[in-house]
Amino acid sequence: MDLADIRQTIDGIDTTLLNSFVERMDIATEVAKSKIEMGKAVFDPARERSKLNNLAGRAPERYEAQTITLFRLVMSMSKAEQQRYINELKGITVSQKAHATAAASDTPFPQTATVACQGVEGAYSQIAACKLFDVPDIAFFETFEGVMRAVRDGFCEFGVLPIENSTAGSVNAVYDLLAQFDFHIVRSLRLKIDHNLLVKPGTKLADVCEVYSHGQAIAQCAGFIEGHGLHATKYPNTAMSAEMVANSERTDVAAIASRSCATLYGLEVLEPNIQDSDNNYTRFVVISREPRVYPGANRTSLMITTANEPGALYRVLERFYALNINLIKLESRPIPGRDFEFMFYFDLDCPFGSKALDDLLDSIDDVCESFTYFGSYTEVL
């Protein structure tokens, strides 16, 4: 057979496979109906293991692993279809709620709003807020939780919080608070962070013994701090540390903060750009008490808890793969009160309104204990 004949044969086999796959997926609804009548869950691990072992045993030895991979994927898509059908019977689905939210907020992202930020004037959260909103009315709070409470209580319409840094990693305190408060992420921003060593006028580097800043900033400037033998002390916020140094009677202290803090608090930039990496970015999220999906949303955030058993997280990841959804962030955090058990945060690169995302939202609960849809939004670069 020449290549043209081989390809023609492959086309015929692929047509047979496609027809069989469609037939297999169509019958998933009948399977769901039977499981409802019998009171059975969508996922039956014993049946699935038995089925996969049987199929692998019938396949040629050289194709056993590929057979398991193929049919595990088919079963995952079948379970997703079964769960989607069951959720539709229950009433409005998660994706339908999300689309209703988008329809209700079918306006551009607001240019002005009351915004809660952690810290004081000059904080990086303030800089982020001013890039996200043209005219933000900013209220400052000492802690991340204070920002959350301000939004929850209606004092501010939005909150701006740092959630991860390209050098120092995730801001775990914010992830933990997201699990406690019923909020929605409506936008995000990647902000380039350039840290500066700020001192009182006339202070020399040789005079500095102790440097104050937020823990994330200290981690991002670890090389500079260690290289100069400085003692680092954590402070609630970079701008607050600059304010503290300005008000201190000591002349042997410095702050790591933004350049704008030097002007605000009468300090000097002793050493500019002291971060370990020039490619230093912090990602900020905008939180809202009300669910909102603005036009152009192409990123989705979820929180998922799984059973504490082998393969539990794999089944979630398998569902993403089956629906061809790109996973761009996975973060695990301990579940309070449950030793050595974790919740998982996912960021997905998937346009809002796509069939893949709708199918995921309407079926993911069959492979996890619980999940929270934080929202779909645009990331500003």
PLM feature spans:
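Domain-level signature for soluble enzymes in the chorismate/prephenate branch of the shikimate pathway
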Residues: 1-381
